[in-house]
Regions:
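Charged, amphipathic alpha-helical regulatory modules used
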Residues: 1-87
Length: 87
């Protein structure tokens, strides 16, 4: 078994959703990875080991404050990285 930070999935899904609504922002792999990294460094990790842990984490992710925190940090990441792309 491996240890996995489930927050990566949550941030990736949120980023994809928010970027799909924006036509004015670079969506290259470098920018997307920079945005993910920026947001992940500001959010608490959610480590899991088993599929049961994955399901529990998925349920916890649905809590309103947790979801709001992810959306807030991903939105900030998009704003910050898109204003200073590294390419």
């Amino acid at each position: 078994m491996k240890i996995y930070n489930y927050m990566e999935d949550t941030v990736r899904d949120t980023l994809d959703s928010l970027l799909s609504k924006r036509k004015d922002i670079c969506k290259c792999q470098k920018c997307k990875l920079d945005m993910m990294t920026w947001a992940l460094n500001r959010l608490p990790p959610k480590y899991i080991v088993t599929d049961k842990g994955r399901m529990y984490t998925k349920l916890k992710e649905q809590e309103i404050q947790s979801r709001a925190d992810v959306v807030r940090e991903v939105t900030r990441a998009i704003s910050y990285i898109s204003s200073k792309p590294q390419h």
